[in-house]
Amino acid sequence: YGNIRMNNFFGVKDIFIDNDIIYLSSSYYEIEKDCHGLALYKSSIENNEKLYINEWDEIFKSEKCLKEEIHTKKRMPLASSGGRIVKLDENNLLLSVGDYAVDGYYAKEKFSQDLSNDYGKILQIDLLTKQHEIFSYGHRNVQGLYAENKKNIFATEHGPHGGDELNKIYREKNYGWPLATFGTGYFD
């Protein structure tokens, strides 16, 4: 992985290749702070008989690094992390960032409904400036993301037990998690 450190079994989430550029989303872990989140990297590809990937450039990192103590109930580390990548247009990608089970059940907070953080969102990332903005929110764990053009964007989402979803995605729309779901808690 070059200069990307994988310290957990939830490492790489997705890759997206655009001509000679490869994008990779991955969970990250900061040892000195003992916290984790999601990051997006890019690199150029050189194809000389063997695929070689140069050093990675970080273009996004979730702004709030999460400590495990945020959870009030036992859960799988880094569950519901998202990480799907799709190209929106020439200069923008969409990236799903899961709620990391900070959903009002496993933790007191409900990140998906809080517009002051990156979690539980689909983000639009400007590849020229590395700036990002919320495209849609109220997501739990988007695991499939497709964009035919700016008007036809679809996402599949892992819901809680019995609550998986297929949604057409619209800019600035709230998809309801965890306030609205057909699923139930795994331990209810």
Regions found by a protein language model. Name each.
Residues 1-104, 144-147, 151-159:
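Acidic, Gly/Ser/Thr-rich repeat motifs that build Ca2+-stabilized beta-propeller blades
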